[in-house]
Every structure is written in structure tokens, then in C-alpha cells.
Amino acid sequence: MLPRLGGTALSLLPLLLLLLGTGGRGARAEVLFRCPPCTPESLAACRPPPAAPPSAGAGPAGDSRAPCELVREPGCGCCSVCARLEGERCGVYTPRCAQGLRCYPHPGSELPLQALVLGEGTCEKRRDAEYGASPEQVADNGDDAEGGLVENHVDGNVNLLGGTGGAGRKPLKSGMKELAVFREKVTEQHRQMGKGGKHHLGLEEPKKLRPPPARTPCQQELDQVLERISTMRLPDERGPLEHLYSLHIPNCDKHGLYNLKQCKMSLNGQRGECWCVNPNTGKLIQGAPTIRGDPECHLFYNEQQGARGAHTQRMQ
């Protein structure tokens, strides 16, 4: 259940975290990326910390709201948001799961990366060595190796290959081998996405294979971005993320259409710009603003659709 990421701040950071988290057994070494520090101006622009959503038994008075676990916005954002709770949907573009939880794709998902990109993961209790499992169990945990999201810590330290311990971290240079493994994984994931859900090896192939479903424009654009990431060269030690800032990762919904709101990643503690697009074509909706916040795209989309309907009636 990949991140469908609908409607939240888009950032290239979580995607790279996810992709690097697919390294499997051969990529357990750690690579550290430090988010740029937040300026006083960016922190001052943040809204007051949110409260936890009301519980199921909340009364009409609405006084049952309690402080939630605050985490940093997806990517390198500076403001605080509520962490996702156990059982809630999660993905690349959503706030991370609460302490002790991790975002996992559905166990039966053939495309765990795609599921997390679509926001179709679920916050579950962590199954790695830090929370009681043995190293052997970690190595054999298919879900963790193939699609688990690593955490984007509030203190700005982001561990790209899983784990949160501070001791024994390897320098970035030692992660280049793991990045090569990461490229192979992404390339293989890309191939699988193009096969339309072909059966795993070891199972009998059906006699008649259905033709793969046509890829939507948003899915095609996402495929192209993943392909570019898989072939990127990282010649220096500035960190993998700095090579991704120029890329725009499309925000697709679970049906493969563009989400109305598209956003650039957060950079240097400043929120990325957001704009509104047509869900079918990805083209800008005329008259909608491009702002560092919520442009309320549904209002402009409904207005556009209403105008088209009125024009059609006049033509008939």
C-alpha cells in the first residue's frame, strides 16, 4: 500500500527515504542526512501545535481533545503535525507514524513501493531489532525489507536506511555501495510496475495473460521520475537528497489520477509552493493560486467544472 499521498506537503525527502529503505539484506548500513536548520522566521510562521483528534467516545462539548505526539512535517518542513496512530493510513507524503510504529505496505502487495507512494500503507508496531525482533527476523521480514518507511525525526536527523540509534553510524561515503543496491531495487520495482501485476517467480504462469492496464499520465510521469532516480550518479559527499531537489514527484491518487493539489518539496525549512491541477491531465487550473500553503484546489476545480457545464448547455 504505497503512499498515495494525497493532499499533504510533498517532499522528495520521504521518497528517497522509502527507496533507500528497500535495500533488503544487502543494505543494512546507515546513511545519515541532516535536514537544513529551521530559521526563526520559518518557525514563527508555523501555526500553533495541533491537538489529537477527538476519541470515539467524545461528547458534544468537544473537550476530549488531547495533545498528540508532535512530529516534523514530511520531508524537511519546520512546522509540527500530529503523528499517525496505529491502524491509520500512511505513506511517503504523510506525517510519520507515532513512536514505536512504522509504515508498512499490505503484506500481499506485489508493488510495496508504489503502495507507499500512494499513501496506502498502514501504521503498525515496528518489527525490527530495536523493538524486540532478532537480527535474523529482521533479515527475513519481507515487508520491512521491501517497503518500510524510515522515520523523519523532529530533531532533523534522518536515517536513510532504517534504525534510529546514534551510535555506530557510518559516514555518508560508506553508503555508496548501499546506494548501488538501492538503484537496482528501484529499477526492478520499475520493471514490475510495468508488468501489470505479473505473478511472482515460482508460481505457474496462467495460460492466458491479460494485457497490462494502460498507465495514466500521472503514473507515467511517476515512472519516469523513478527511472531518473534509479540512474542518478552521486559523485560527491553532499548527500543523496541534494541531487533530487530539482525533481518534481507527481502526487497521484489510488486510481492513478493527479491529486488536485501538487506541491514542491520543503527546502531550507521553508514550505514548498503548492498549485492546483486537473486530475486527468495534470495541467494547471486557471485562476487557482500558487502559494506556500493550501490553495483550496477543490473550490477552483468545482468552479471550472461548473463553467464547463454551463458552456456545454449553451452549445446544445
UniProtKB/Swiss-Prot annotation:
One GO term (biological process): positive regulation of activated T cell proliferation
Extent of motif Cell attachment site: 292-294
One of the record's GO molecular function terms: protein phosphatase inhibitor activity
Keywords: Disulfide bond, Glycoprotein, Growth factor binding, Growth regulation, Secreted, Signal
Functional note: May have both growth-inhibiting and growth-promoting effects, depending on tissue type; increases IGF-induced DNA synthesis in the uterine epithelium. IGF-binding proteins prolong the half-life of the IGFs and have been shown to either inhibit or stimulate the growth promoting effects of the IGFs on cell culture. They alter the interaction of IGFs with their cell surface receptors.
Signal peptide start-end: 1-29
Record's keyword annotation contains Magnesium: no
Posttranslational modification: Cleaved by MMP9 leading to release of free IGF2 from IGFBP2-IGF2 complex, which contributes to enhance the motility and the growth of astrocytes.
Assembly behavior: Interacts with IGF1. Interacts with IGF2. Interacts (via RGD motif) with integrin alpha5/ITGA5; this interaction induces cell migration, adhesion or apoptosis according to the context. Interacts with PTPRB; this interaction leads to PTPRB dimerization and inactivation.
GO cellular component: extracellular region; extracellular space
UniProt KW ATP-binding keyword: no
Superkingdom classification of source: Eukaryota
InterPro entries from the UniProt entry: Growth_fac_rcpt_cys_sf, IGFBP-2, IGFBP-like, IGFBP_1-6_chordata, Insulin_GF-bd_Cys-rich_CS, Thyroglobulin_1, Thyroglobulin_1_sf
Domain IGFBP N-terminal: 31-126
Annotated localization: Secreted
Region feature (Disordered): 189-217
Disulfide bonds listed in the record: C35-C76, C38-C78, C46-C79, C68-C82, C90-C103, C97-C123, C218-C252, C263-C274, C276-C297
Protein name per UniProt: Insulin-like growth factor-binding protein 2
Sequence ranges assigned to domain Thyroglobulin type-1 in this UniProt record: 215-297
